[in-house]
A protein has these predicted regions:
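Conserved S-adenosyl-L-methionine
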Residues: 119-121
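Intracellular loop-helix junctions on the cytosolic face of multi-pass helical membrane proteins
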Residues: 22, 41-49
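Short, surface-exposed "cap/lid" segments of acyl-processing enzymes
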Residues: 53-54
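Class I (Rossmann-like) S-adenosyl-L-methionine-dependent methyltransferase catalytic domain
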Residues: 2-37, 58, 62-65, 70-77, ...
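Conserved acidic residues
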Residues: 187-188
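Helix-to-beta-strand junctions that scaffold the AdoMet/dcAdoMet cofactor pocket
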Residues: 199-200, 215-217
Length: 282
């Protein structure tokens, strides 16, 4: 796929011809024409790690990491899913953008002393650790909380891969609603990435309230919107049972505003699926 550099970030993009072919042919075929039984048969015959993991645990951390890593494809079906599907492409774009934004926030707060980052629903923590590595700052700690500790061992390996000291990253199994019982520091940055698209508005409000209470005045929250611009929402629902809650950047900012955040900054990845949003506690 072609690449496009925007503000120093190398993104995956589609050519105008590819956009037309996807909209006119590929997406309708996947969404409405191909029988579910035939698709599942093809996935079963394929050796694609991404597709098999998406069947077992749709939206789980393993399928995310497979998409992020973007390793060599194992067969032509895997190539189509991993290399040419807009969804994994946009996920990789989002990770790059989130890491860059986190890096910028670290640099902003590091001038005043030690920086603490709270990752909610953090999974492996790759977004946070990538941002930490990019910043090059040593006075940064990440506190990564998730209900499921399944991803933590993999995340510890990523910590070593990014060249971060193991004491700089803490993996915490628990519910973010009880965050004060899990961490004793005050974070300057809270990250809500890869979680709110699986939650209702009321559930998001609860996490935003927890985030607001954890942050000092002037602290930042980072989250994102998601749109159907990937073009295969119906396909992912009927094949993988992946039911996402789509919110525009405007809607996410409305929810953040209700929780007491403002001074919003929004950056978009070029495929139009994700926008990264930063708000500041008033």
């Amino acid at each position: 796929m072609p690449l496009k550099t925007i503000d120093g970030i190398e993104y995956e993009v589609l050519t105008p011809a590819q956009v037309v072919v996807k909209k006119a042919l590929i997406n309708p075929l996947m969404n409405y024409v191909l029988p579910k039984s035939l698709v599942l048969y093809g996935i079963n015959k394929s050796r694609s790690p991404l597709l098999k993991e998406s069947i077992l645990r749709p939206g789980g951390w393993r399928s995310m990491e497979i998409s992020y890593e973007n390793g060599p494809h194992v067969d032509w079906v895997d190539m189509l899913a991993l290399k040419f599907s807009t969804f994994p492409m946009s996920l990789r774009n989002r990770r790059k953008l989130v890491a860059r934004v986190i890096c910028g926030l670290i640099n902003h707060y590091a001038a005043a002393g030690h920086v603490n980052i709270l990752g909610i629903g953090a999974g492996t923590g790759t977004n946070v650790m990538s941002g930490m590595a990019q910043s090059g700052k040593k006075n940064v700690s990440a506190h990564l909380i998730d209900l499921d500790s399944d991803a933590f061992e993999y995340g510890q390996g990523l910590c070593r891969k990014y060249g971060l000291h193991e004491d700089a990253v803490s993996f915490i199994e628990g519910d973010a609603v009880d965050i004060k019982s899990h961490i004793k520091v005050t974070p300057q940055i809270v990250k809500l990435v890869g979680i709110i698209e699986y939650l209702s508005d009321d559930e998001v409000r609860k996490l935003l309230a927890v985030s607001r209470d954890a942050l000092p005045r002037g602290g930042s929250i980072l989250s994102h919107s998601i749109s159907r611009a990937h073009g295969v929402d119906r396909f992912t629902r009927r094949i993988f049972n992946l039911n996402l809650t789509y919110r525009s950047d405007t809607r996410v900012m409305e929810l953040m505003g209700e929780a007491g955040f403002g001074d919003f900054r929004v950056r978009h990845e070029p495929l139009g699926v994700y926008s990264v949003i930063v708000g500041v506690k008033k």
